[in-house]
């Protein structure tokens, strides 16, 4: 799905359907209006059970120390949903296909980390 964010940035959104063992993954790639970067996001990677907020903060801090290229966090005021984030910077002289390739490689890295970290987080925080 191609669209624009509330701020007017171009965005590509992908949703991978879950099965009995995995929830849906919402991948988002937001291209900055100035063309210098893209924000890669996996939305709602983990849902935190009621009363597990402190456990979630500790677990996310551990994930942030272990997985240096991806940030695990709560988006905005939502403290029940864990989001994964990565930013990709582009050089002014880069061709568009190279920028797209960096985004794909970044998402691939994020999905690999997601596959490793999220099952453990879901078990711990549900």
Where are these regions (language model features)?
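Short, internal acidic amphipathic alpha-helical interface segments
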Residues: 39-81
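Short strand-loop junctions, especially beta-strand C-caps/beta-turns
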Residues: 43-45, 87-91
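Short, aliphatic-rich beta-strand segments
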Residues: 82-86
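A short acidic/glycine-rich loop-to-helix N-cap element
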Residues: 90-106
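Long, contiguous binding/interaction regions
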Residues: 107-112
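Long, charge-dense
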Residues: 114-117
């Amino acid at each position: 799905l191609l669209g624009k964010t509330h701020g007017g940035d171009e965005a590509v959104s992908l949703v991978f359907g879950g099965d009995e063992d995995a929830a849906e993954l919402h991948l988002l790639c937001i291209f900055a209006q100035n063309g210098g970067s893209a924000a890669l996001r996996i939305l709602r990677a983990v849902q935190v059970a009621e009363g597990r907020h402190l456990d979630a903060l500790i677990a996310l801090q551990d994930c942030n120390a272990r997985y240096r290229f991806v940030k695990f966090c709560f988006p905005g005021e939502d403290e029940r949903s864990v989001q994964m984030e990565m930013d990709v910077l582009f050089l002014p002289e880069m061709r568009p296909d190279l920028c797209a390739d960096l985004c794909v490689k970044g998402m691939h890295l994020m999905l690999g980390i997601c596959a490793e970290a999220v099952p453990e987080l879901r078990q711990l925080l549900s």
